[in-house]
From Swiss-Prot:
Quaternary structure annotation from Swiss-Prot or TrEMBL: Homomer.
Single GO cellular component term: cytoplasm
Binding site for Zn(2+): C75, H78, C146
Record-listed E.C. numbers: 3.5.4.16
Superkingdom as given in the UniProt entry: Bacteria
Protein family (similarity comment): Belongs to the GTP cyclohydrolase I family.
Protein name: GTP cyclohydrolase 1
Species the sequence originates in: Streptococcus pneumoniae (strain Hungary19A-6)
Gene3D superfamilies with a match to the protein in the record: 1.10.286.10, 3.30.1130.10
Length: 184
């Protein structure tokens, strides 16, 4: 990540909006923003493979659900945050991931400029590709600051997105069971 370019760009934005980039409260802002971007965009170029490849053998194939995984990310359209909760269900095929690995999967894909729909897809596809699940179902509920702070200005509006893979695509009863277990 080119932090010098980020700092220069932030200084230009500060000046472009009519502020003095050298005043006391803004002098360190370009460096702060560059450090923040290093942190919140740390998922760029990463996949969840390293997390999901550490799995455990299991002999049954009962559904695993992890819900209320808090995340925050940046909308790639306005570079404003959106945040919420991800709910994950999957059907193992002989292997299960450690529970923290599901949260880490959400984290990897949320640490980059993102849209909610793609975040759903990336998490579900990672479960299928790297864990070898028989099915994956991901529901994300989020509030988007680009809707709350600007434009339509409707704070508190929740956007829900879903994606189903494998067995969840074809089995409505299985999806319904996942919804119930997720409390949705």
């Amino acid at each position: 990540m080119d932090t010098q370019k980020i700092e220069a760009a932030v200084k230009m934005i500060i000046e472009a909006v009519g502020e003095n980039a050298n005043r006391e409260g803004l002098q360190e802002t370009p460096a702060r923003v560059a450090r923040m971007y290093q942190e919140i965009f740390s998922g760029l170029g990463q996949t969840a493979e390293e997390h999901l490849s550490k799995s455990f053998e299991i002999i049954d194939d009962n559904m695993v659900v992890e819900k209320d995984i808090f995340f925050h990310t940046m909308c790639e359209h306005h570079f404003l945050p959106f945040y919420g909760r991800a709910h994950i269900a999957y059907i193992p095929d002989g292997r299960v991931a450690g529970l923290s690995k599901l949260a880490r999967t959400v984290e990897v894909y949320s640490k980059k400029p993102q849209i909610q729909e793609r975040l759903n897809i990336e998490v579900a596809d990672a479960l299928m590709d790297y864990l070898g699940a028989k099915g994956a179902f991901v529901v994300i509920e989020a509030e988007h600051m680009c809707m709350s702070m600007r434009g339509v200005r409707k704070p508190g509006t929740a956007t829900l997105t879903t994606v189903a893979r494998g067995l969840f695509e074809t089995d409505k009863d299985l999806r319904d069971q996942a919804y119930r277990l997720m409390g949705l």
